[in-house]
Structures are given as structure tokens and as C-alpha cells.
């Protein structure tokens, strides 16, 4: 009987771990977030209400977020009739419904849900504006990180992390990039 050398076994195990993997789904506390239009989002239940749910953390003062507003508006428009729900969440200590409602209306953004105390942000590991989490229809985290690879400029060659994850999930595939770097302003949660 021939025994495989230890180096071969280690290599085989390491290769089995290669490739994209979906991020671990965090334990999300039961919360009801009220948005600027008077609607509510109950987590974690509502995260599995659509084919794909995209949660984007928002900060009114963040120039990185402002730069990405056009891409967010396009994301909402392009996927609205395909079962994709986009939820903007403001976890900042200074967040008010009135200020966020005004900002959403002026900037053409969807209603913004308030996350007092940053409980949802903490549960999802969101420390920066533009941090995005994409959930599948079972409410599992399938992507987490930045909207794309841009920080403060909209480059045509930016890696479209969120759009690619949404397209992959709608096509029944694993997201090709399950994690990306979040580039934005630090959330002032407390």
C-alpha cells in the first residue's frame, strides 16, 4: 500500500479551498427599520422577500457615496422589474427622517431606511458608506463589499461588483466575486 506524501495532501486540501466562496451569512438581529417614505423593512425576514435584495449603507455627507449615486439610480432602474430590491440604510448617529427624505428626493434616490444605533450596520460588518451586502432569495449573504472598485471617480473600467453579483444570482450562478473592498467614508454610528 502506497501512502501519499504529506505535501501532496496539503496541496490537495489547499486546492479544494480555492475559488470564490459566498461570505458567511451573519446573525442578524430582528429589527424594524422605518424609511423616509414611511415604509418599514423588517430584518432579517424582508431580506428574503425578493429574488435579490441589495442593502447599501448611506451617509449624506460622504463624497464617495455622492459619486456613486448615478450608479445606484441606474441599478434601481435596471432591475426594478426583475425582482431586485435596493434598500439604502443610514446608520449614522446624526440621521433624521426629515433630512434623509429631503436628500432622497433631491438626489433621486429610493427611500432611505434609518438604522438607529447602527445595529444592522454592526451585524453586517458595515463600517463605511457605500458598503453593500447582496442577499439571495433565501436571505443568505452572497456578496459584501463596495458597490464597485471606484472610490471617488466613476471610471468606465471599474469592476462592477454589485451589478455582477446581481446578474450572477438572477442567472442562477454563484457570484463571481463574493467580496470586494468597500471604499467610502467611515460611518459615524455612535
Predicted regions mapped to residue ranges:
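Bacterial signal peptide processing site
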Residues: 19-21
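Short active-site neighborhood of thiol/selenol oxidoreductases, capturing the structured segment around
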Residues: 46-66, 166
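A short beta-strand-turn-helix
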Residues: 31-53
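Short, thiol/selenol-centered motifs that function as redox-active sites or metal-ligating centers
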Residues: 59-70, 93, 183-188
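Bacterial N-terminal signal peptides that target proteins for export
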Residues: 1-8
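Structural microenvironment flanking redox-active thiols in thiol-disulfide oxidoreductases
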Residues: 66-107, 113-123
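Thiol/selenol-based redox catalytic cores and closely related redox-interacting motifs
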Residues: 116-190
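C-terminal motif of bacterial Sec signal peptides marking the signal peptidase cleavage site
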Residues: 15-17
Amino acid at each position: 500500500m502506497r501512502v501519499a506524501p504529506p505535501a501532496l495532501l496539503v496541496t490537495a486540501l489547499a486546492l479544494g479551498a480555492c475559488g470564490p466562496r459566498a461570505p458567511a451569512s451573519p446573525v442578524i438581529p430582528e429589527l424594524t427599520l422605518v424609511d423616509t417614505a414611511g415604509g418599514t423593512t423588517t430584518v432579517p425576514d424582508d431580506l428574503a422577500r425578493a429574488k435579490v435584495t441589495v442593502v447599501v449603507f448611506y451617509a449624506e455627507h460622504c463624497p464617495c457615496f455622492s459619486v456613486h449615486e448615478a450608479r445606484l439610480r441606474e441599478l434601481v432602474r435596471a432591475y426594478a422589474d426583475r425582482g431586485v430590491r435596493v434598500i439604502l440604510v443610514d446608520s449614522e448617529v446624526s440621521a433624521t427622517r426629515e433630512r434623509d427624505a429631503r436628500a432622497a428626493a433631491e438626489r433621486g434616490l429610493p427611500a432611505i431606511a434609518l438604522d438607529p444605533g447602527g445595529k444592522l450596520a454592526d451585524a453586517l460588518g458595515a463600517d463605511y458608506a457605500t458598503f453593500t451586502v447582496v442577499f439571495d432569495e433565501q436571505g443568505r449573504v452572497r456578496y459584501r463589499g463596495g458597490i464597485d472598485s471606484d472610490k471617488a471617480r466613476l471610471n468606465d473600467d471599474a469592476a462592477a461588483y454589485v451589478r455582477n453579483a446581481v446578474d450572477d444570482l438572477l442567472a442562477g450562478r454563484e457570484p463571481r466575486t463574493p467580496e470586494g473592498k468597500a471604499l467610502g467614508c467611515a460611518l459615524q454610528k455612535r
